[in-house]
């Protein structure tokens, strides 16, 4: 843990952030060509930037006047909230077109560079640094408001946008934005939004959930201008319960991959939707400005006291129904399942569809924000003579008021009651929609004897927070006591101090006492015997630690180390045994590959990895390379230069795009449908027309994308020739949801690719694979040369692509006399990929023979085999076993295990040496 003296900050004494930022003119956060630019609000009541009323229609003013009697408490706070908004904006650096959004469909959106990105480049899921969030206090500036996006932000225009109300209503209608603005009463009020995953990383440190790593800043408060939902539904004549109107569903505009392709949607009960006490609204302004693109421009739902997942952004449809929403995200998101339910059990036993596990209202929660993580409190004559002020926030759900916050410094033996600050007043129904703040002065000498500080809150129903964390599959609603650990340190020669440690740091940032204790726990449970490998001396796995720079040196076949979840592994002796070949390890050697490892490995593989652990990564208070996408939020770094344009190294021009250990961004430039479920995707290379992909024949690439907040990586073999310049092509079979009984949700990556818009970008990594065809019958297999005059090439389904690549390379060389015998199995004729190309090549070249096998023929006159690959089929259509004959195979594991391997053995093939499986 890093310690500093000269530039350290002290929680209650820390300087305001305005010292390192500049004032700027308030305005929308987007560039000149943004589709939301130029939208104005002719009937807005208040210009917050100039603190003066704006023109408003008589109709709206009259409607507002009718509410004056009941809105005193809100109006009393209006000037105070306005001042907070203006002050917060003036202290905030301008948002920028972040280089991390280059090559994505969100590249037009300006964002605050200090936001901590939780899911890589795209989609944009982020939270502000906790200390910045708390600096602004009650009202969060829009650029620092947490963001939860499932996919691409829709490009919307105010003039074209409509919201449809349909279903069980007497008068279905579509409302333009101007109608929503001019024809309905409005009032502004503050509401706190919280992601149900707030504090999830604490759960992930105990056991990995299926969600990404939210820290404790997935919470923000804004002032929202609104159209009451109940008014809109009354205008449309919502039907009664007796006539079946039981639920109100909301649907957004974004196209998402979940469930095989869908919009984001959810629902609430009709009684809630029509309850005026709930203040459920269609919001079109946030903190006195139009909604930002990331927050739902031009209109979104706000349901105070509920989790953020119910507040649909980019709202397009409101449907009154009898049943609750049947949207994929309504069922497969925002659930708290029992702790024993893992992903397999949840799917097998349909836990997702049990209504008792849905999350609506927030639970009671509280967090310690001062002291900051890794803050150092020096112990000297001056600091011990004055109290130290602990601070934090708290919130509850359903409009319930937080009534008490308590702090313990002796593990719950005794509790001290904190001072509460409630900046909001209740609405006329007694509801509280916002967070509050707590503080407690403690003696520094008491901190010296405390091992930890913990906080818990109570609301008006006397609910409080549990002492211990309760894990659940989605990692949601974590509200156990928030604990900050204390340790003694020597920040400078002759000084001692107390260093404070929060449980975790958000995203993939390392740090936090849970991270440290997890490492120690695993070390204790691991085999304590000494281990030795080719590349490392004897070492004790429980005590060895390494810096990132040390690990970086081990990036070769002679010594291949990787970092996963803060542990260091020496994988050198596993290189020859890895099913995907040594490239699969070497491509990440010397790096932190946590996300990629988790994306493509099973639980079994993760357990196997423990055999290769040699120590732990040393973490400091400063950002490492593995967290370079996040700002340096250490409390020891007082300077903030996030308002400056980042200095980036110019990319080195190179003839080939692929480079080991690097992900390269490639833009989708065309998408062609070959059939109802087969697509050809063409991706441009970053180096333009003078650059080749650089993929050796026989090897593959990883396609990387963030889907539903998690990194997804899949191996693909391009079908374009290796000498194509400026682009590569993939032929992909899209596995849609609900088609294959064994895979009801379909293929994650293939559906994601199908949903991509032309112009959007994904990452590519490679080359990978243990087989390389070097030409004229020569192969390199696991680094050793092999030769064949004849090739038996056996493929199943999409496994044709590496076979196709080798065939293509051989036929391109007129001096390559290698003979090829392809047997290609599929379910039906319609499933055969690249058939036209294969048939054309076979007619023109005597070196190539192609035979098809289908499980069932759906057309008359089928002249090839029906059924499965059998010994007889192979004897008729591939060469006999010989020293100069190799078999190449790629397809489903069952085909390789039960059809290819045993039947080749019956033909006397040496399958250990002469069968090469891609």
UniProtKB/Swiss-Prot annotation:
Residues 543-618 form the Cytochrome b5 heme-binding domain. FAD binds at residues 714-717, 731-736, 743, 748-750, 801. Its cofactor is FAD; heme; Mo-molybdopterin. The keyword Endoplasmic reticulum does not apply. Binds 1 FAD per subunit. Residues 661-774 form the FAD-binding FR-type domain. Mo-molybdopterin binds at residue 195. SUPFAM superfamilies: Cytochrome b5-like heme/steroid binding domain (SSF55856), E set domains (SSF81296), Ferredoxin reductase-like, C-terminal NADP-linked domain (SSF52343), Oxidoreductase molybdopterin-binding domain (SSF56524), Riboflavin synthase domain-like (SSF63380). Heme binds at residues 578, 601. Induction: By nitrate. This is Nitrate reductase [NADH]. It comes from Cucurbita maxima.
């Amino acid at each position: 843990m890093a310690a500093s003296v000269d530039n350290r900050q002290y929680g209650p004494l820390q300087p305001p952030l305005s010292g390192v930022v500049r004032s700027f003119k308030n305005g929308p956060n987007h560039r000149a060509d943004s589709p939301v630019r130029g939208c104005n609000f002719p009937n807005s009541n208040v210009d917050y930037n100039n603190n003066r009323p704006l023109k408003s229609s008589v109709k709206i003013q009259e409607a507002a006047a009718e509410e004056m009697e009941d809105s005193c408490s809100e109006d009393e706070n209006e000037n105070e909230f306005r001042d907070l908004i203006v002050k917060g904006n003036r202290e905030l650096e301008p948002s920028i077109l972040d280089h991390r959004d280059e090559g994505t469909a969100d590249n037009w959106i300006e964002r605050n560079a200090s936001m901590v990105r939780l899911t890589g480049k795209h989609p944009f899921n982020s939270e502000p640094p906790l200390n910045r969030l708390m600096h602004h206090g009650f009202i969060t500036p829009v650029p620092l408001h947490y963001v939860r996006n499932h996919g691409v932000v829709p490009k919307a225009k105010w003039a074209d946008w409509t919201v449809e109300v349909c279903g069980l209503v007497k008068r279905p209608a579509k409302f333009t934005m101007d109608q929503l603005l001019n024809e309905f009463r409005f009032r502004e009020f503050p509401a706190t939004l919280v992601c149900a995953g707030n504090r999830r990383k604490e759960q992930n440190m105990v056991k990995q959930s299926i969600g990404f790593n939210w820290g404790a800043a997935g919470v923000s408060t804004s002032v929202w201008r609104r159209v009451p939902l109940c008014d809109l539904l009354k205008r449309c004549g919502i039907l009664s319960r007796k006539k079946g109107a039981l639920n109100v569903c909301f649907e957004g505009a974004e196209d998402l991959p979940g469930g095989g392709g869908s919009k984001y949607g959810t629902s609430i009960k009709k009684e809630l939707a029509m309850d005026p006490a709930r203040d459920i609204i269609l919001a079109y302004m946030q903190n006195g400005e139009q909604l930002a693109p990331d927050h739902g421009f031009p209109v979104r739902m706000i349901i105070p006291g509920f989790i953020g997942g119910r507040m649909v952004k980019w709202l397009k449809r409101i449907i009154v129904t009898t049943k609750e929403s049947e949207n994929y995200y309504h069922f497969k998101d925002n659930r708290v399942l029992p702790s024993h339910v893992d992903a397999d059990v949840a799917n097998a036993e349909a836990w997702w569809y049990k209504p008792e596990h849905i999350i609506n209202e927030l639970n009671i929660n509280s967090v310690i924000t001062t002291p900051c993580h890794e803050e150092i409190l020096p112990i000297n004559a001056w600091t011990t003579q004055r109290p130290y002020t602990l601070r934090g926030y708290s919130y509850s759900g359903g409009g319930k008021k937080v009534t008490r916050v308590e702090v313990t410094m002796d593990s719950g033996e005794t509790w001290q009651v904190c001072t509460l600050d409630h900046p909001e007043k209740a609405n006329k129904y007694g509801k509280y929609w916002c967070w509050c703040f707590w503080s407690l002065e403690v003696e520094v000498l008491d901190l010296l004897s405390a091992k930890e500080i913990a906080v818990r809150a109570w609301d008006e129903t006397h609910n409080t927070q549990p002492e211990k964390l309760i894990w659940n599959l989605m990692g949601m609603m974590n509200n156990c006591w928030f604990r900050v650990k204390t340790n003694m340190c020597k920040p400078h020669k002759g000084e001692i101090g107390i260093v404070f440690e929060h449980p975790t740091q958000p995203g993939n940032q390392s740090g936090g006492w849970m991270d440290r204790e997890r490492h120690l726990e695993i070390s204790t449970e691991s085999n304590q015997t000494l281990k030795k490998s080719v590349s490392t001396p004897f070492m004790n796995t429980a005590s060895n630690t390494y810096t990132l720079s040390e690990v970086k040196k081990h990036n070769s076949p002679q010594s291949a180390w990787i970092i996963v979840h803060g542990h260091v592994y020496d994988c050198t002796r596993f290189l020859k045994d890895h099913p995907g070949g040594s490239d699969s390890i070497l491509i990440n050697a010397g790096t932190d590959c946590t996300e990629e490892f988790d994306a493509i490995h099973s639980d079994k593989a993760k357990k196997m990895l423990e055999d290769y652990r040699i120590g732990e990564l040393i973490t400091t208070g400063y950002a490492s390379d593995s967290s370079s996408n996040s700002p340096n939020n250490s409390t020891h770094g007082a300077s903030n230069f996030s308002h400056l344009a980042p200095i980036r190294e110019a990319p080195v021009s190179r003839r080939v795009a692929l480079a080991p250990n690097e992900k390269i961004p490639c833009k989708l430039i065309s998408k062609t449908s070959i059939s109802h479920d087969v697509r050809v995707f063409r991706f441009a290379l970053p180096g333009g027309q003078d650059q080749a992909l650089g993929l050796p024949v026989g090897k593959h690439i990883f396609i990387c994308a963030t889907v539903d907040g998690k990194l997804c990586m899949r191996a693909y073999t391009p079908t374009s020739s290796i000498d194509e310049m400026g682009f590569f092509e993939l032929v992909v079979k899209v596995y849609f949801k609900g088609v294959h009984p064994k895979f009801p949700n379909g293929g994650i990556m293939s559906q994601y690719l199908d949903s991509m818009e032309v112009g959007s970008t994904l990452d590519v990594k490679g080359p990978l694979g243990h087989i390389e065809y070097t030409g004229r019958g020569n192969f390199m297999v696991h680094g050793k040369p092999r030769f064949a005059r004849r090739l038996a090439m056996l493929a199943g389904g999409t496994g044709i692509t590496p076979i196709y690549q080798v065939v293509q390379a051989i036929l391109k060389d007129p001096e390559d006399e290698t003979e090829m015998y392809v047997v290609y199995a599929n379910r039906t004729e319609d499933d055969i990929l690249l058939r036209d190309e294969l048939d054309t090549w076979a007619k023109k070249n005597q070196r190539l023979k192609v035979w098809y096998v289908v499980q069932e023929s759906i057309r008359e006159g089928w002249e090839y085999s029906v059924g499965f690959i059998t010994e007889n089929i192979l004897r008729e259509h591939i060469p006999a076993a010989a020293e100069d004959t190799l078999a190449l195979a790629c397809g489903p594991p069952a085909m390789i295990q039960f059809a290819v391997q045993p039947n080749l053995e019956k033909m006397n093939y040496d399958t250990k040496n002469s069968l090469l499986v891609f």
